[in-house]
Amino acid sequence: IVVVLWADRKLRLSDALVFLGTLVLTALPALLGGKSIGALLSIYTAQTGLYTGLTYNAPSFFALMNTTGLDVYAYGNFGMALAFGVCALLVSAGVKRAGRMTRAGYLRLALLLPLAIVFFLPRMHERYFYLADILSVALAAYDKKAAPVCALAVFASFSCYWETLFSLPVCALVMLAALILTLRHTQRDENVI
């Protein structure tokens, strides 16, 4: 969404200092606790081999299929390519409409990105949908027509903690419904995508 906001001239290059400052502030406790800068910068690359499953209780694309016996690396690469492609399409559509989107449109696009990225990426935990949950609540508060999207996204995320109540594939279908509904609202109201 930052790229779209820069294309719309709503952010300046100097605003990047806010992002950099936030990164430094979030790293400060670990630095004070004795972690090296190298360890902090390589934390995600160091974890790449730790998780080999396709989903870790996330209501995602991979929760819709039986992953037993699948080549997790091939499917994982497919999921990464799919997530990258969807993200590139959403960002390019937002850049194309820059300057002509409403605040609700920016909020919808901001919601679509974490919904789509986390839904299609492999090896996701349910907690990675928190940003989508928060943005769906913000969108519903701003635009009452988005209340069903909020209900679906939050229900799918919250239900992952009660696997005995709703199965993970059901939660994934609900999250997919939230993604599609947000996409349809964005396309209809903002002529994006």
Name the predicted role of every residue range.
Residues 10-18, 22, 106-113, 129, ...:
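Alpha-helical transmembrane segments of integral membrane proteins
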Residues 20-55, 59-68:
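Transmembrane-lumen/periplasm boundary regions of multi-pass, lipid-linked membrane glycan transferases
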Residues 2-10, 33, 91-100, 139-144, ...:
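Structural signal for the C-terminal ends of transmembrane alpha-helices
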Residues 1-21, 31-35, 131:
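Perimembrane helix-loop-helix junctions
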Residues 47-120, 184-186, 190:
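Aromatic/glycine/proline-enriched transmembrane-helix motif characteristic
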Residues 1-6, 25, 116-129, 155-163:
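Transmembrane helices and adjacent periplasmic/lumenal helix-loop junctions
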Residues 19, 134-138, 173-177:
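Alpha-helical transmembrane segments of multi-pass membrane proteins
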Residues 43-62, 92, 110, 143-193:
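Transmembrane helical bundles and short interhelical boundary loops of multi-pass, membrane-embedded
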